[in-house]
Amino acid sequence: VERLKANLPANSTLAEFPSLFYVWVGMNLDNPKLKNIKLRQAIQAAIDVPSIMAASYFVAAEPSTGIIAPGLSGHRDQSLTGIEANLEKAKKLMAESGESNVSLKISVLNKSVNVTTAQIIQANLAAIGVTVEVDLHEGATFWGLGEDKTLELVLNRYSMTPDPYYATSWFITEQAGVWNWERFANAEFDKIHKDAQSESDLVKRDAMYQRAQDLMEESGAYKFITHEATPNVYRNTIVPALRPDGMPLYRYFKKD
């Protein structure tokens, strides 16, 4: 994006839009290697999101605070675990966990941005004594990993609609082992997901979805990374039809 800005093709426009995708690191709560919440919290504290933004996204994307994008009901201004790595906190949590010689595997869809992100996480966790193996998958095998009870860490990316109900729907208890790969099960979260659908008070609804994301982080099973970004380059001879999140609607494009 920065290169394009500096050398934009003649007679063209670069437009940048927020994205409805969300990227995170998940931890399988049913795996015995990740049962210790202090270990999971140490992993959360050790991951440095700004480094990922610089190396994987070339500073074209911003760190996220949860699964709900900015501008939508339920978006949080801050996450509970922070954006920058806190190695002092992470090392303290590791000591409190009593764990040593920890070795984990992070499963990743084989795309360059994901591989770079996984390598940064690998380096981050090495700083607190956790060895990480990057396990690359093609799409056919990656999207079946939710059924794998031995899954450890996973770098994942989902999309959502402008209504936050769609975002939380994948993390309820009944989705464990389907789309809820962390196998996160929380009765309060499930109730929020159900009740927020019919909540007409927008302030209350906003608070409910913020609380839902707090619960996800408090479980130690999630480290939120980014919503990514959606840049578009188009010729000035056309009038593009773009959704608010930047996704093109080609059938509605027309000549200027």
Where are these regions (language model features)?
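Extracellular/periplasmic solute-recognition and catalytic clefts
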Residues: V1-N31, R157
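Ligand-binding "clamshell"
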Residues: E2-A15, D148-L151, P164-V178, R235-V239
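Periplasmic-binding protein-like
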Residues: T13-G26, D30, L34-L72, T116-T117, E174-D190, ...
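Structural transition elements
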Residues: L34, E62-E96, V113-T116
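Extracytoplasmic/peripheral linker and loop segments enriched in polar/acidic and small residues
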Residues: K38, T131-F142, S169-N236, D256
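Ligand/substrate-recognition segments at binding pockets and active sites
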Residues: A61, A95-M160, W181, L202, ...
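Long beta-strand-rich cores associated with HINT superfamily self-processing modules
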Residues: N232-D256
